């Protein structure tokens, strides 16, 4: 069994914000494949899908971003899921809007939701699907940036990023992290 966790903030007022790209991807995964009814479990909205014969829980913590680990840690322990089987989808300001980067592990990179997961999971060794939300405008704070909706002009990139991430998550669930990273990470241009 695997957990696929999308990070975000609960509530209508946060629904379309950049910080909620993880929730948007989870919803798009659920819209693309048959799934069970959503239910509340360990302070998260949870449903299950089946990928390649394996049960996968789709998870949207309802604790607010900075406390996400308080939901994910207990879910992981309840279902006896190894950290390497907890796939986390979240926003990344260091990537251009809609761009995806998959990593098998790593530090929080200053992301408070990831800091909370690391604290409650007990390790940095869990897979990440980072979705770009771009850098804030010079006059904006980081908080203003992540809690603002995507601009109208960026919607095409956002929707493509969500679609690409859905494909990457489902594909990686089928082929495993190493092959998934090779297949779905952006290809680097050779150095000249």
What does each model-identified segment do?
Residues 2-105, 115-119, 123-129, 136-141, ...:
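Nucleotide and nucleotide-moiety/phosphate-recognizing core
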Residues 108:
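Conserved TIR/SEFIR loop-to-helix hotspot centered on a Trp-containing motif
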């Amino acid at each position: 069994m695997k957990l696929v966790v999308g990070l975000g903030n609960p509530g209508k007022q946060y629904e379309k914000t950049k910080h909620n790209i993880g929730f948007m991807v989870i919803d798009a995964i659920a819209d693309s494949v048959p799934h069970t009814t959503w239910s509340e479990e360990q302070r998260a909205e949870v449903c299950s899908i089946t990928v390649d014969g394996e049960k996968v829980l789709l998870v949207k913590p309802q604790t607010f971003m900075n406390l996400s680990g308080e939901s994910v840690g207990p879910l992981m322990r309840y279902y006896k899921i190894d950290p390497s089987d907890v796939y986390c989808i979240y926003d990344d300001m260091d990537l251009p809007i809609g761009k995806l980067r998959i990593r098998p592990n790593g530090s929080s990179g200053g992301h408070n939701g990831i800091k909370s997961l690391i604290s409650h999971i007990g390790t940095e060794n869990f897979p990440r699907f980072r979705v770009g939300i771009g850098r804030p405008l010079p006059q904006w704070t980081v908080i203003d940036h992540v809690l603002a909706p995507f601009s109208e002009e960026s919607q095409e990139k956002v929707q493509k990023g969500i679609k690409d991430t859905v494909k990457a998550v489902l594909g990686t669930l089928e082929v495993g992290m190493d092959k998934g990273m090779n297949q779905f990470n952006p290809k680097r241009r050779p150095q000249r």
